[in-house]
């Protein structure tokens, strides 16, 4: 069975430049090894990156040992649900691609919070509630 996104559809890729995902497969897939739940497909902003650095999660600096290139504003990256939620509470949440955000993110983050920051909302949002 295919992984599902927070809207109930098939999980879409998040990013391939740089290649994201806990499994470095371009998707915000998760599994038992992913203890941090890297399930939110976020579009990096300077504010979000600065916030993450401030809480001890430096996403800007490369870490070659983990195939991590370091991120810049505009990059799409699978971030942990807890860190995204913390940024949301602190007023600096990164925009979210709902179709690429794994349904397991909902174990931590309310759907309404994700929708508030969605960048892939269709012209008719009512169509999401079929």
Put a short name on every predicted segment.
Residues 1-47, 120:
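Extended boundary segments
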Residues 43-58:
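Short, basic/aromatic beta-hairpin or loop at an interaction surface
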Residues 60-67:
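Short alpha-helix capping/helix-loop boundary micro-motifs
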Residues 84-107:
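Short, compositionally biased
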Residues 102-130:
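Glycine- and charge-enriched low-complexity intrinsically disordered segments
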């Amino acid at each position: 069975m295919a992984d599902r996104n927070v809207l109930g559809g098939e999980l879409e890729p998040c990013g391939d430049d740089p290649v994201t995902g806990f499994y470095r497969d371009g998707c915000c897939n998760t599994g038992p090894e992913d203890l941090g739940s890297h399930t939110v497909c976020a579009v990096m902003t300077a504010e979000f990156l600065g916030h993450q650095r401030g809480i001890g999660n430096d996403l800007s600096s490369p870490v070659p040992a983990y195939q991590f290139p370091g991120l810049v504003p505009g990059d799409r990256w699978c971030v942990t649900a807890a860190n995204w939620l913390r940024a949301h509470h602190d007023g600096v949440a990164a925009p979210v691609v709902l179709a690429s955000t794994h349904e397991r993110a909902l174990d931590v983050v309310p759907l309404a919070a994700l929708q508030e920051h969605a960048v892939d909302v269709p012209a008719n949002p009512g169509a999401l509630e079929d």
